[in-house]
Design a protein with these regions (language model features):
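RNA-contacting regions in translation and RNA-metabolism proteins
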Residues: 1-167
């Protein structure tokens, strides 16, 4: 697996001076380090992980979003979801795999999966700010943590979501 942290640090958990500086500057967080090391620990079992670029992890409420490069989400989602279950067991969180640098529609589809998106559009507010409205198919599901999803979208993509439901 590739990441902002070097292979030595990912494997040993001991930070070299370069990686420690990244941590101190906030370019890498403790959470990033923790998740990256979990992924590295199962690389031999799931070799597709060797090609995955891990960009970081973002936590909101009980949801942990794992950010990977465009095209890498499927590698983690293969193996019948075993990698997801491993991460859920280890962290106690609900896991989402998101591509941080993909197009906005794909990002939102992955964020709200398995719900399907009917419409995405922009709303310009009188104060000049823009919201991205996402209309999901179905009635509001209590299992969907809308606030956590909004926070993840804000932190990863800088977009303000307005989430609605329609049949
Ligand atoms: Zn290092």
């Amino acid at each position: 697996m590739k990441a902002e942290l070097c292979q030595f640090c990912l494997r040993s958990g001991i930070l070299c001076s370069k990686c420690r500086a990244k941590l101190e500057r906030g370019e890498v967080t403790r959470l990033d380090l923790e998740i990256a090391r979990l992924l590295v620990s199962i690389e031999d079992k799931y070799p597709l992980l060797q090609d995955v670029y891990f960009h970081g992890a973002v936590e909101a409420d009980n949801i942990l979003a794992i950010l990977v490069r465009r095209g890498d989400a499927n590698k983690i989602l293969s193996y019948g979801g075993k990698i997801i279950r491993f991460l859920e067991d280890k962290t106690g969180k609900s896991i989402r795999i998101l591509e941080y640098n993909t197009n906005e529609r794909k990002f939102l589809e992955d964020l709200f999966s398995p719900l399907s998106i009917l419409t995405i559009n922009k709303i310009w507010l009188p104060d000049g700010t823009v919201e991205t409205r996402v209309i999901l198919k179905g009635r509001k599901k209590s299992s969907l943590n809308v606030n956590a999803m909004r926070e993840i979208a804000k932190r990863v993509r800088g977009i303000t979501l307005r989430v609605e439901f329609a049949d």
